[in-house]
């Protein structure tokens, strides 16, 4: 909150509602109702973030109900997260005070939730792309209670494609009325969050304006904040060095300058002194080969099957695989690789092992500490040796991404701030991220799969069907641990 004061944009927040996400997740902290309550006194805290433990809400879990009751009592917005929740369970969820949902993957589900009085956030991000399936919501009367969101989006996508402006462009290209699409990306969102002083061009509202070249390409020519020209032709104006952002311009992102790097390092050095815990969030032993031993318990193995452009997974049951030179259970022919998640906040030594399918990896390993929502260390690979190397590279960097193959680390991106953020400029991060993506393609990962964003969601036990975290493989619908081999 303090870091976003005095910027040339207004930053608002909603408080995390589920830390950890469910009882079958392991985070670095636990936030209860009393931990959240004081922040509501800040006018820039608008409400409660996505209530993802829908099973707990429907069951009337005490701590969750306490958070919902407090937010509701204060008239705060309560965001939802309830994929596939229908019927009486949806009724119970809505009765608990949840206002919205951003997890709809088809129009039928969205229309049922609209019919229960919820708002629908139409999501189009890097990994989850639901816009095309939800285009019927751009028709009257549905569009009046819908808005546009990205959920997670890689920095490179923000630079090259844009943010909400990209979703508007994409919707218009799919046949949406441009005025409706713009309204869903501006006024509707402001109305939902209770920001009555902005969101439209009219007397009495704040002069926060985006000037477009036309209503077809939705290209932003200029931006005004509080009536003052703040950006023009992709260049941020005003105090400090002017910095061009090539979002939505179709240009290749440039790498950051030496001055950018030195400035970032100087700033991060001061922050590291002020907030040592944020820069020292990795508390785990080195990963060893014996940590990856997954014993065969039966003739079958359970695979977490990825779906292109979706966060949803499927359960796939196949005979146990044995291929010389690969980890037990792994099969390149069947597109099955091993997955492991290691707790890294509190030095518990907890881990979960399993298998994922549809990732496309043909050799080597990929590791990341960007793993929603607890952000433990996750690694997938075809063999244990490369998995150990990739995992330990992330640990050594105190967070980040790493790729290993044929016995060596071939690429890495350090994210030492909480294990999820970089000291570098967005251009430098994107340059390194693209280099890593090239490596993952060389290792076989399909262009239909975002190698890192896909892994970032595979450990979140609130999106069906299967996930993997430090508890092991989780059946989300049943909120139950299930064996990877049986």
Which residues does each predicted region cover?
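Active-site core of metal-dependent hydrolases
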Residues: 46-185, 190-200, 209, 213-214, ...
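Divalent-metal coordination cores built from histidine and acidic residues
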Residues: 1-75, 141, 410-413
């Amino acid at each position: 909150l303090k870091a976003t004061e005095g910027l040339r944009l207004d930053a608002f927040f909603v408080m995390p509602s589920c830390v950890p996400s469910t009882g079958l997740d392991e985070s670095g902290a636990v936030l209860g109702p009393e931990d959240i309550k004081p922040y509501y006194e800040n006018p820039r805290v608008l409400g409660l973030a996505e209530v993802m433990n829908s099973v707990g809400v429907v069951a009337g879990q005490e701590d969750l109900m306490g958070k919902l009751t407090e937010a509701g009592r204060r008239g705060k917005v309560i965001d939802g997260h309830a994929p596939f929740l229908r019927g009486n369970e949806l009724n119970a969820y809505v009765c608990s005070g949840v206002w919205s949902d951003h997890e709809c993957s088809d129009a039928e589900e969205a229309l049922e939730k609209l019919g229960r009085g919820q708002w629908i956030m139409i999501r189009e991000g890097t990994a989850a792309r639901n816009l095309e399936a939800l285009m019927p919501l751009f028709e009257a009367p549905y569009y009046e209670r819908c808005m546009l969101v990205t959920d997670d989006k890689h920095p490179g996508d923000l630079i090259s494609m844009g943010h909400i402006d990209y979703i508007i462009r994409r919707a218009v290209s799919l046949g949406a009325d441009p005025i409706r699409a713009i309204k869903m990306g501006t006024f509707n969102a402001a109305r939902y969050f209770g920001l009555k002083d902005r969101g439209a061009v009219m007397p009495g509202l704040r002069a926060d304006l985006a000037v477009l070249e036309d209503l077809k390409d939705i290209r932003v020519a200029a931006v005004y904040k509080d009536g003052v020209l703040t950006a023009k032709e992709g260049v941020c104006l005003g105090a400090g060095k002017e910095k061009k952002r090539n979002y939505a311009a179709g240009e290749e992102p440039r790498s950051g300058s030496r001055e950018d790097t030195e400035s970032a390092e100087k700033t991060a050095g001061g922050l590291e002194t002020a907030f040592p815990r944020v820069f020292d969030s990795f508390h785990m032993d080195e990963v060893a080969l014996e940590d990856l031993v997954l014993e065969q318990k039966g003739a079958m193995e359970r695979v977490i099957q990825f779906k292109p452009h979706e966060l949803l997974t499927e359960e796939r049951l196949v005979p146990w695989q044995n291929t010389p030179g690969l980890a037990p259970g792994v099969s390149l022919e069947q597109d099955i690789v091993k997955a492991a998640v290691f707790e890294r906040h509190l030095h518990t030594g907890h881990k979960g092992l399993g298998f994922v399918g549809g990732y496309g990896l043909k050799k080597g390993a990929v590791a990341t500490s960007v793993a929603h929502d607890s952000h433990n260390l996750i690694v997938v690979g075809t063999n244990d040796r490369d998995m150990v190397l990739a995992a330990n590279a992330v640990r050594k960097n105190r967070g980040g991404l790493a790729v290993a193959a044929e016995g060596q680390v071939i690429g890495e991106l350090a994210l030492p701030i909480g294990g999820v953020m970089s000291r570098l400029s967005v251009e430098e991060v994107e340059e390194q991220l693209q280099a890593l993506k090239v490596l993952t393609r060389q290792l076989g990962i399909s262009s239909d799969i975002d190698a890192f964003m896909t892994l970032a969601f595979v450990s979140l036990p609130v999106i069906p069907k299967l996930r993997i975290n430090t508890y092991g493989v989780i059946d989300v619908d049943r909120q139950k641990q299930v064996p990877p081999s049986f």
